[in-house]
Amino acid sequence: MKTLRVVLVGLMWATVAHAGNLPPVQTVFVILLENHVWSDFSGGTNASFINGTLLPQASHCEQYYNPPGLHPSEPNYLWLEAGTNFGILDDNDPATNHQNTANHLAAQLDNAGISWKTYQEDIGGDVVPLTSINGYTPRHNPFVYFDDMTGTNNPNDAHGLAHIRPYPELAGDLLNNCVARYNFITPNLCDDGHDACTPQNNAVQQTDDWLASEVPKILTSAAYSNNGALFITWDEGEGSDGPIGMILVSPLARGGGYFNGIYCTHSSFLRTMQEIFGVSPWLGDAANATDLSDLFMPLAISSPGRTANGAFCLDITGVVPGLTNFVEASTNLVTWNVISTNWSSSNSFSIVDNTATNHDWQFYRVRKAW
């Protein structure tokens, strides 16, 4: 009897540094929320959108934490951007805590020619927002703490004004399909769950209501549909390191309510961003972190069996819609022949290998053309 051996080789972004095991995400959206452990939201009656709508279609982490002992907010936002808090353990404004370094994600994106923006709720957009106004606070906006992003605390800096924009502009950018590849979103102090505000006077419900209103705008956009990814997380646990929430919604995610118990931190998020965009070197503790690749759908080959004439049926899952996949076969793991070239509009496809009837051993792999 002929025996099938399946070998999977995932050739993902082979020309880009640090690609890891991640699919080719085109556009990233990040929503940063405030000061709640995951149990405040998971299964809670005040978070009906998260539990009833988001989680059933998402992947999420059950063991995601802020870095050990790192509090309050500002150090965690800095960590998400740079993999370190630069020794900062307070929430002071950039006038005190600004950093003269290019060792952070936005600078790497700039150097690589990769577009990015941060959308901050309650800013005016006429100046770089270096101090608090309305429900906006700088400590929830890591970019204003880096001199190369603000011209060293210059409220009129052109680079800062171009990249740090009022949140309402996101809707128009989504509609016109002109969003950047990396989009960092900070709601105001009511909508992010930091404060209890009227009329709900319930921080968890406020956040859930805001997400219910705003997330659909992202998920119905062309940028999201074209291999986009939305990450929703929190800065820190209130009174603890967590676990806090990390939710991924993406056409490329495992989805369907998948969750894992892998220990991850903000360093994992940063490493994942560096892998997605192929920028280096590793920033701070990202060098030591496990990435979030398990939340994405893995490439896999399986066989439901043979046809009546002895051919092998192959099911390939975890492919990226809209890209070309080459299924190759070998009898010796040295010489590989393409047996199928497939462009799939979904995350899976099936083929039949009629050549398998001629061999005692047959190995398979899938190559993806980026």
Residues of each region from the PLM?
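Bacterial N-terminal signal peptides
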Residues: 6-15
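Short, composition-biased motifs enriched in small/polar/acidic residues
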Residues: 298-370
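Sterically constrained small-residue positions within well-ordered secondary structures
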Residues: 10, 21, 71, 176, ...
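Positively charged n-region of N-terminal signal peptides that target proteins for export
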Residues: 1-5
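N-terminal pro-sequences and low-complexity stem/linker regions of secreted or lumenal proteins
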Residues: 19-300
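Short, threonine-centered small-residue motifs that mark membrane-proximal processing/anchoring sites
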Residues: 17-19, 327
